[in-house]
Amino acid sequence: MKELSSAQIRQMWLDFWKSKGHSVEPSANLVPVNDPTLLWINSGVATLKKYFDGSVIPENPRITNAQKSIRTNDIENVGKTARHHTMFEMLGNFSIGDYFRDEAIEWGFELLTSPEWFDFPKDKLYMTYYPDDKDSYNRWIACGVEPSHLVPIEDNFWEIGAGPSGPDTEIFFDRGEDFDPDNIGLRLLAEDIENDRYIEIWNIVLSQFNADPAVPRSEYKELPNKNIDTGAGLERLAAVMQGAKTNFETDLFMPIIREVEKLSGKTYDPDGDNMSFKVIADHIRALSFAIGDGALPGNEGRGYVLRRLLRRAVMHGRRLGINETFLYKLVPTVGQIMESYYPEVLEKRDFIEKIVKREEETFARTIDAGSGHLDSLLAQLKAEGKDTLEGKDIFKLYDTYGFPVELTEELAEDAGYKIDHEGFKSAMKEQQDRARAAVVKGGSMGMQNETLAGIVEESRFEYDTYSLESSLSVIIADNERTEAVSEGQALLVFAQTPFYAEMGGQVADTGRIKNDKGDTVAEVVDVQKAPNGQPLHTVNVLASLSVGTNYTLEINKERRLAVEKNHTATHLLHAALHNVIGEHATQAGSLNEEEFLRFDFTHFEAVSNEELRHIEQEVNEQIWNALTITTTETDVETAKEMGAMALFGEKYGKVVRVVQIGNYSVELCGGTHLNNSSEIGLFKIVKEEGIGSGTRRIIAVTGRQAFEAYRNQEDALKEIAATVKAPQLKDAAAKVQALSDSLRDLQKENVELKEKAAAAAAGDVFKDIQEAKGVRFIASQVDVADAGALRTFADNWKQKDYSDVLVLVAAIGEKVNVLVASKTKDVHAGNMIKGLAPIVAGRGGGKPDMAMAGGSDASKIAELLAAVAENL
């Protein structure tokens, strides 16, 4: 077996499959593009679903890739096991309706065992297979695998919901008896026992059925196009080929671990307690790549995952004695390890470091807040006479504040309290079950549509015309091909068309189809790409249509021009965002409609009003500069040399279209555009908002809609000016400010008057002092305007030694407000109010020294006051 670096393993994998006629699919962005079912790209096949479900036919049915992936459903296991990671690299080879079982197994065995390639010893390889899949068993035998090395496993059948499914065969490497201390042997495989002896290095999925949850597996229909989907973990292959005990001792992780050794002054012991080293090395890889791909830490979705990973890594750094910000210092090491295939981490190093460091600094402040919350919980336990911190509270510390359970346990036990481990596990399991359920719901592929996949007739989109005559090539009605149609809805393919199919954020054209007499025979309501790329027109049929007949196709020109204004403005906006807030503000989604444009981009905070003003100004400057718009067709490399901005995650063919707006913007784009930027007329941002962690959205309008937006603002300003009696529009802001200042002064004066009135009334209230259970207390109903006045009473009470406890009740409108304040450790205000509030049909809580409650039954106020003594 060859001893190769991880980079050599990756390259040899790709080279082997290229020698078998495969095209190399570049690694996609970790943030899925146009796939809301996935939080992250989590496998090599995740970006190829469109090929497997038949919605798109690839140029080459043989594909290979090395795909960076993230899975975070079991974060807690990272660092505890030898092979669990959040970010990993999946090597794959795929066949879309081309070769199948025989070639997949034979070529796979060749790659693993040939001296020209990996050169694994054959006697160290074991394979599992689905018991009913005798063909795979026989093919392995034909390759020279001993029957004793083939293990039937009932679970070797891959399916996730509806869509492609089939048996799979897994390949394992036997590391020998040293990793099998109990000498269990092949039962480890047969009974799926967790072990370190047999390491799964490759899984070959034989996708041959359309899974249908409504029928038994034996009744699944064969796929019209059988597929091969395989995945081999680079980290596992590296561990085996480099003789490493775990994945972490490979060249993918050890350079990071060595840097952590320098930062901590501690030494990594492969046989000792090394969990913190592993967690940090794993998590900084995931953070570096995810942030580089446009995801940012936040409180939900992907952002929440990244924030949790970072905080977990920081806490493990503290366990190693690293108390200052340090994770950001590891980003260059991650980039250097992966540079040969993934240069993006080093290219975006400064930005990634900035985000990681900023998040570390934020977490340092959060730790202080979490410590304060834990202190409050422990104080409450003491007041209530309890000795155990509940699992739900531990989980809240963990989930909300990022506190590891070990830290909570350590601090609580130091204070003399026990930990409710079972309650915590229960809360954790509930969250994990929710996460796994979400993954299962979104994981399936669509079923293949044989009718659409069977369209092979050529069709060409013509960019520079709004109307043309063309022959009707294909009619599909009720999911069947037909030669003619006279009513209902149908799908049509023409030899050529002026109708743009929805793509790249630009909506489809609409329009009409006319016969040779000039009569409208169909209305085009939508256009989408067929699996083989042809524009597929969805039409409402008004009169007879037949294959082979020529028709005149006319798009709605006015609508197209409105869409083009927004699409061209989107390119200007993208460039302006780069100039004003930074090059990290890359496109995360867009929509170019007739009435507006919507542009999503990566950014870590709200865009300020001043920045929006600059962006809007810059876009309009380019409109007024009347920049010429040109389009060029070339290859991707030439386009990049031209400075074209490629959207990360988009797949480009051999020939790409470059749209250049003067010297201001150059992008790869297949959409339609204006001839000159001046045709946009006017650009106006109407909204900026956050739509998820690290993703912002701008909605803008152009042309007529922009003019109307400005006019609406002017009308609103005129109305405000009239209301505040401003002599001119320019004076309205000053008049509003003057009124606001006057109102603030009056409110301040009102508060002062209320405080004086409360102080005067307090003299009478504080005279009525009672005593019970050795505690002096005041219990009184007061007449106040709001709950804030009750707090003013309490503040005055605290200034002097009137009593130990104060209970005030006020009927304000239809509600009852209750306040309890305590100066003695013998009475916990928060606990006391829980006993009093139900009397007035209310509830509340608070701290040991102050608590408040709200109720709805004012008729029971006297009863509440009478109950104060017994609730002390």
Swiss-Prot record:
PROSITE patterns: AA_TRNA_LIGASE_II_ALA. It catalyses: tRNA(Ala) + L-alanine + ATP = L-alanyl-tRNA(Ala) + AMP + diphosphate. The keyword Endoplasmic reticulum does not apply. Its cofactor is Zn(2+). Zn(2+) binds at residues 567, 571, 669, 673. It is an enzyme of class 6 (ligase). Binds 1 zinc ion per subunit. GO terms for biological process: alanyl-tRNA aminoacylation. Keywords: Aminoacyl-tRNA synthetase, ATP-binding, Cytoplasm, Ligase, Metal-binding, Nucleotide-binding, Protein biosynthesis, RNA-binding, tRNA-binding, Zinc. Its EC number is 6.1.1.7. One of its GO terms (molecular function) is catalytic activity, acting on a protein. It comes from the Bacteria. It is found in: Cytoplasm. The keyword Cytoplasm applies. Pfam families: DHHA1, tRNA-synt_2c, tRNA_SAD. One of its GO terms (cellular component) is cytosol. Belongs to the class-II aminoacyl-tRNA synthetase family. Consists of three domains; the N-terminal catalytic domain, the editing domain and the C-terminal C-Ala domain. The editing domain removes incorrectly charged amino acids, while the C-Ala domain, along with tRNA(Ala), serves as a bridge to cooperatively bring together the editing and aminoacylation centers thus stimulating deacylation of misacylated tRNAs. Catalyzes the attachment of alanine to tRNA(Ala) in a two-step reaction: alanine is first activated by ATP to form Ala-AMP and then transferred to the acceptor end of tRNA(Ala). Also edits incorrectly charged Ser-tRNA(Ala) and Gly-tRNA(Ala) via its editing domain. NCBIfam families: alaS. This is Alanine--tRNA ligase. It comes from Streptococcus agalactiae serotype III (strain NEM316). The gene is alaS.
